[in-house]
């Protein structure tokens, strides 16, 4: 059975009407008024869909068995008659990104769809479907069937990781944030802005700033990162702590040479061999010579100029906050800009950034931490999302300062860990970040209920 959102694939007994955009409140209400069946299957892409054997029966039976609000499934990408399995991830409490990947179809029981659309606020042009999904999730489970129940031809689903920082999408993101903030209030996970200033100088430190570089096997880039850190200038003392996670490609030897000629350079090799990036960060921030502020520099990247650390320190001192996050420019290995260019996270506001941070997939870079705070929180020992987890935990209680000009250059190249992710790796990363959000939402609910310190 072939179906499609494209009108040229229509059938007899089908009602055709124009809706623009598909995700608006009015479009969803029009669908609800027009549908007189027991179930509604939404095709949320422009692909041609072919259901597999007994797929409809499989989905519809589970819709009642689990009182499911929404059902989605894994699928095949079909190209030139070749089928490639495409697995998705399970929906959980923290699956609140507006670009969560449901694949190409979402399956609803009509009675639940009607209930949700009747509660849907009028006027959303872009966030209607997002609001519908969040509202359904409050009352009903959202179920993934880990079976390939259809194939999709053309228009592969792409999770647009930087939509929330693209100025062209500002109107979209304002709606999404409004919907999400309302959702947090409904589930008692909304928090008020932290207002207390930190006493940044109640403790003594040998250095004001430490640049922390976790590294493993970055022979090609580590020298540039080290030189970028050591070239910083400012009205403070600083050092560089490189946590070398047992590199075996020559990186260790390069670092030993560089450390000999720089008294402010600490080359640290952890005792343990089971550390990921988060664990290496913990080694750095707990080092006896770590400065008052610990500032990120990835082993692939460099600071924009010699004033990056000074700009970060200025924000700490002015705003008396626990964390400062800058903006960065995306480039290739030769420093040529690549889309979307500058990532500045202007979606962040002092009034609601700490709530909206649960909706987006990252906080920005470079990230800098007030060392006594990050020593209490620590990073999870993982190599993806460790910074996001720490940032969310800090935002729960403390202010976060922002710098909206690019002070950091993030390079994408064939050896970079974020390049050319497989479906499996991308699913692993997304599931983990959703789990971080799940835990954070639960903690904030407990805080609001007076059950968590």
Model-assigned labels for residue ranges:
Residues 79-103, 340-360:
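Short, flexible, basic/aromatic active-site loop/helix in glycosyltransferases
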Residues 2-12, 227-237:
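Short, acidic, metal-binding catalytic loop of nucleotide-sugar glycosyltransferases
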Residues 22-35, 271-289:
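Glycine-rich, basic loop-to-helix element that forms the pyrophosphate-binding segment
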Residues 53-85, 307-340:
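Conserved donor NDP-sugar-binding/catalytic core segment of glycosyltransferases
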Residues 122-132, 383-390:
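Acidic donor-binding loop at a coil-to-helix junction in glycosyltransferase catalytic cores
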Residues 36-50, 291-302:
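Short beta-strand-to-loop acidic/aromatic patch adjacent to the donor-nucleotide binding site
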């Amino acid at each position: 059975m072939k179906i499609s959102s494209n009108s040229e694939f229509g059938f007899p007994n089908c009602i055709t009407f124009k809706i623009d955009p598909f995700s608006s409140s009015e479009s969803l209400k029009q669908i609800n008024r027009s549908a007189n069946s027991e179930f509604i299957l939404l095709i949320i892409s422009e692909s041609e869909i072919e259901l597999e054997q007994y797929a409809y029966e499989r989905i519809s039976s589970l819709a009642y068995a689990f009182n499911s609000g929404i059902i989605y499934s894994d699928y095949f990408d079909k190209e030139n008659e070749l089928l490639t399995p495409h697995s998705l991830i399970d929906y959980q409490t923290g699956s609140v990104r507006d670009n969560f990947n449901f694949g190409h179809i979402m399956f609803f029981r009509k009675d639940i769809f009607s209930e949700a659309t009747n509660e849907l606020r009028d006027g959303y042009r872009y966030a209607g479907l997002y609001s519908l999904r969040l509202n359904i999730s409050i009352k009903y489970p959202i179920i993934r069937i880990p079976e390939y129940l259809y194939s999709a031809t053309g228009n592969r689903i792409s999770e647009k990781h930087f939509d929330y920082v693209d100025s062209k999408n500002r109107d979209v993101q304002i709606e999404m944030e409004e919907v999400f903030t309302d959702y947090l209030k409904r589930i008692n996970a909304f928090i008020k802005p932290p207002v207390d200033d930190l006493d940044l100088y109640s403790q003594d430190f040998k250095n004001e700033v430490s640049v922390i570089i976790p590294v493993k096997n970055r022979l090609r880039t580590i020298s540039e990162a080290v030189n970028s850190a050591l070239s910083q200038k400012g009205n403070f003392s600083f050092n560089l702590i490189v946590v070398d996670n047992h590199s075996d490609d020559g990186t260790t030897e390069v670092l030993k040479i560089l450390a000999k000629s720089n008294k402010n350079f600490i080359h640290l090799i952890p005792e343990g061999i089971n550390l990921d990036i988060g664990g290496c960060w913990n080694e750095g921030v707990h080092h006896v010579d770590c400065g008052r502020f610990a500032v990120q520099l990835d082993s692939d990247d460099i600071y924009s100029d010699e004033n990056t650390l000074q700009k970060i320190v200025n924000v700490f001192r002015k705003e008396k906050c626990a964390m400062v996050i800058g903006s960065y420019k995306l480039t290739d290995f030769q420093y040529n800009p690549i889309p979307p260019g500058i990532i500045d996270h202007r979606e962040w506001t002092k009034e609601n950034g700490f709530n909206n941070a649960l909706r987006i997939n990252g906080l920005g870079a470079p990230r800098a931490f007030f060392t006594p705070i990050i020593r209490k929180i620590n990073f999870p020992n993982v190599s993806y999302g460790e910074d996001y987890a720490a940032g969310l935990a800090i935002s729960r209680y403390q202010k976060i300062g922002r710098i909206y000009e690019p002070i950091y250059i993030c390079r994408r190249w064939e050896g970079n860990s974020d390049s050319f992710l497989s479906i499996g790796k991308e699913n692993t990363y997304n599931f983990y970040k959703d789990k971080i959000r799940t835990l954070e939402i639960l903690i904030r609910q407990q805080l609001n209920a007076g059950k968590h310190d």
